[in-house]
From Swiss-Prot:
This is Urease accessory protein UreD. Signal peptide: none annotated. It holds the Pfam family UreD. It is found in: Cytoplasm.
Length: 271
């Protein structure tokens, strides 16, 4: 399968500091130079050099975080998927976390416009004592008729393996031809967000405290969370605006950083 963009990147710890040990990219995918907003932790910005994803695009990203290394990754801006009359856009991401490593992978929202079809497949392999923070936000794009869900469909599959055992399979399927406003769908909301944590300290006590932190959020929003096998927690959010979901995920991320990593919240410095 010919790819529109490819990114392969590895991070390793050297002299008490994480460095980017190898990096290869081609096509429409680029990556910024590492920015050390924290002394030992490189922050990377994934960059798409085109105006958005279009018909038949295929993107492949491979990230490897070596033993005891720490890496934070985000995007430069939202991912925009435009009309796909012939073939859906496909985005595949493969992540490997070695023993004791930490990856914070928090991307900007996905915006799907009228006629868009999008397949997202993310596979994560986690080794012992590693930590993984992940977010995903899906929002409807603008349509000239004012419809709330102009895209054709979205398929998002997230698989997490710990020691080669499948501990999470999250399959999110959104198809506006169905009643998206009904129960077991979006329940009257338009935007959906996910925040995922895997960390050895993410136990029931942490889950309860995180719930209290989220419950204090005063806005028109619905959310739920549950524990997962192998010290994991998943948070799902429904809202009517991107900003509300981003604020909730930011709060959850800051709380998790403080409680699990002993670090302050992070400002990604996007303008």
């Amino acid at each position: 399968m010919k790819c529109t963009g490819v990114l392969q990147l590895s991070a390793a710890k050297k002299r008490q500091k994480t460095i980017i040990s190898s990096c290869y990219h081609e096509g429409a995918l680029k990556v910024s130079r590492p920015i050390y907003l924290e002394k030992d932790l490189p922050f990377l910005y994934l960059i798409h050099v085109g105006g958005g994803y279009v018909d038949g695009d295929v993107y492949l990203t491979n990230l490897d975080v070596e033993e005891e290394a720490e890496l934070a990754v985000t995007t430069q801006s939202a991912t925009k998927v435009y009309k796909t009359p012939k073939k859906p856009v496909v985005q595949q991401t493969n992540i490997h976390l070695k023993k004791g490593s930490v990856l914070e992978y928090l991307l900007d929202p996905l915006i799907s416009y009228k006629g868009a079809r999008f397949i997202q497949e993310t596979t994560v392999h986690i080794e012992e004592d590693s930590g993984f923070f992940y977010s995903d936000v899906i929002t409807p794009g603008w349509a000239e008729d004012g419809s709330l869900f102009p895209y054709d469909w979205i398929r998002s599959k997230l698989k997490v393996y710990k020691k080669d055992r499948l501990v999470l399979f999250d399959h999110l399927r959104l198809e506006p031809d169905e009643d998206m406003s009904g129960m077991l769908q979006m329940d009257g909301y338009t935007h959906i967000g996910t925040f995922l944590i895997f960390h050895q300290k993410a136990d029931k006590t942490f889950l309860d405290r995180l719930y209290d932190e989220m419950e204090a959020f005063d806005s028109d929003v619905r959310f739920g969370m549950t524990s997962l096998p192998a010290s994991g927690i998943i948070l799902r959010i429904l809202a009517r605006s991107t900003g509300i979901i981003e604020n909730m995920i930011s709060r959850a991320h800051s709380f998790a950083r403080r409680e699990l990593l002993g670090k302050n919240g992070v400002t990604w410095r996007k303008y």
